[in-house]
Design a protein with these regions (language model features):
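Conserved active-site alpha-helix within GNAT-family acetyltransferase domains
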Residues: 52, 76-96, 103-106
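Residue-level signal for secondary-structure boundary sites
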Residues: 80, 118-121
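Acetyl-CoA-dependent GNAT
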Residues: 1-44, 52-57, 61, 65, ...
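Short hydrophobic/aromatic beta-strand or adjacent loop that forms the aromatic wall/cage
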Residues: 7, 106-110
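Conserved GNAT acetyl-CoA-binding A-motif
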Residues: 62-76
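Flexible nucleotide-binding loop
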Residues: 48
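Residue-level signal for beta-strand positions within conserved beta-sheet cores that form or flank
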Residues: 32, 68, 107
Length: 133
């Protein structure tokens, strides 16, 4: 067994099949800010609301842990357009952009949502998966 981690993994399954997952955790050196590290949905079921429901579940989990701010970092490239749309339609704002962060022409974009100001969305029932260190 490795050391304990602050990462939280949640997995959504239908009929035993993994349809999506998220990974999030507290942002180091902050009090109440969390990072969404990963969100992934099976390509065959994208567009069915699973991404929104997983985001809502993360928001609930963060608030249950006394968190109030959720940050998501992503790329500015066209291949991440669907992810950016998911965040924006979920009430996240692009608060910062760092030009050429990943490489020339690929900028880091930081999306943020204040969970104390946002209305509650419907969350999915998901399985908790222990972090692997």
């Amino acid at each position: 067994m490795g050391e304990a981690s602050d990462y939280v993994f949640l997995v959504y399954r239908e009929e035993g099949r993994v349809m999506g997952y998220v990974c999030f955790g507290p942002r180091p050196l902050t009090s109440g800010a969390y990072d969404l590290y990963w969100i992934a949905v099976d390509p065959f079921v994208q567009g069915c609301g699973i991404g929104h429901a997983l985001l809502a579940r993360v928001e609930t989990e963060v608030k249950d842990r006394k968190g109030y701010l959720l940050l998501i970092e992503t790329s500015s490239t066209p291949s991440y357009a669907a992810a950016r749309h998911l965040y924006e339609s979920g009430g996240y704002r692009c608060e910062a952009s760092i030009r050429d962060f990943y490489e020339r022409g690929d900028h880091l974009q930081v999306f943020v949502k204040d969970l104390e100001q946002a209305p509650q969305q419907e969350a999915l029932a998901v399985d908790r998966v222990p972090a692997i260190a």
